[in-house]
């Protein structure tokens, strides 16, 4: 009888202390935080490689903005924003979390053609 009681005590102690796996897409330990800043008339880094779900923090200087554009607009130094793309105003900070594996192109409107960059998401 005492052996059974001890066994049950140990069983419930270990069972109550075990941790349930709560890893979901919203709580993914494999995601990373990346920061994009401005320096003179450039984004730093000019090309960022990351993964779906990573957090990308934009920290823009006062005379810079960042708007997402199409690849065509990017290549032609055209600041036309794409529909439903990300946009951060002059001197703003903000977060962008990519949900699609593709290349996101963005520019600083007043500093084209020098100030443009891309985010490559795998």
Q: What label would you give each PLM region?
A:
Residues 10-11, 101:
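Residue-level signal for mature regions of secreted extracellular proteins and peptides
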């Amino acid at each position: 009888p005492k052996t059974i009681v001890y066994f049950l005590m140990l069983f419930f102690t270990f069972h109550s202390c075990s941790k349930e796996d709560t890893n979901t897409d919203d709580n993914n330990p494999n995601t990373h935080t990346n920061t994009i800043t401005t320096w003179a008339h450039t984004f730093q880094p000019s090309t960022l490689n990351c993964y779906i779900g990573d957090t990308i923090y934009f920290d823009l200087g006062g005379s810079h903005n960042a708007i997402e554009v199409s690849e065509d607009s990017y290549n032609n130094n055209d600041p036309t924003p794409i529909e439903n793309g990300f946009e951060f105003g002059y001197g703003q900070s903000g977060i962008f979390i990519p949900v699609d594996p593709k290349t996101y192109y963005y520019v600083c409107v007043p500093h084209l053609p020098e100030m443009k960059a891309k985010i490559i998401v795998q």
